[in-house]
Design a protein with these regions (language model features):
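Glycine-rich phosphate-binding active-site loops on the catalytic face of alpha/beta enzymes
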Residues: 6-10, 54-70
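Alpha-helix-loop-beta-strand connector modules within alpha/beta enzyme cores
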Residues: 16-37
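Hydrophobic faces of well-ordered beta-strands that scaffold small-molecule active sites
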Residues: 2-4, 35-39, 57-61
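Catalytic cores of alpha/beta
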Residues: 40-55
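Short, electropositive alpha-helical surface patch
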Residues: 21-26, 52-60
């Protein structure tokens, strides 16, 4: 596989990114290997869907995932009060993490996954 730069970047965006769909299509037609898009957090859903349509194979969405997990912890009180209890932290983040992953799976492969 090949990770490509087409308007994406790691971490949080200062402004809404605009993916270069012409470049994605051009790379897809020129290369016989799967294309990977890093830095997909906060890229608008319609841009991710268009990337799928153009042949993008894999999407890395860590920042947005971590944010969803953090919100799960915060919903259950002050994270500082957890005293480093990782089991408790993981249990508190699991519902948010699962919901986030399911949502992205539905977005990127709407005909393949049902939950």
């Amino acid at each position: 596989s090949l990770a490509v730069a087409v308007g994406n970047a790691h971490g949080a965006y200062v402004q809404t990114p605009n993916l270069d769909f012409d470049r994605i299509a051009s790379l897809r037609s020129a290369l016989p290997i799967p294309l990977v898009l890093h830095g997909c957090s906060d890229i608008p859903p319609e841009q991710l869907q268009e990337s799928v349509r153009l042949g993008m194979s894999k999407f890395n969405i860590a920042t947005e995932y971590f944010r969803a997990c953090y919100h799960g912890v915060v919903q259950h009180g002050d994270p500082a009060e957890k005293n480093g209890d990782m089991f408790r932290l993981m249990m508190e983040t699991s519902e948010n993490a699962i919901d986030f992953v399911r949502g992205k799976m539905r977005l990127l492969n709407p005909n393949k996954f049902t939950f």
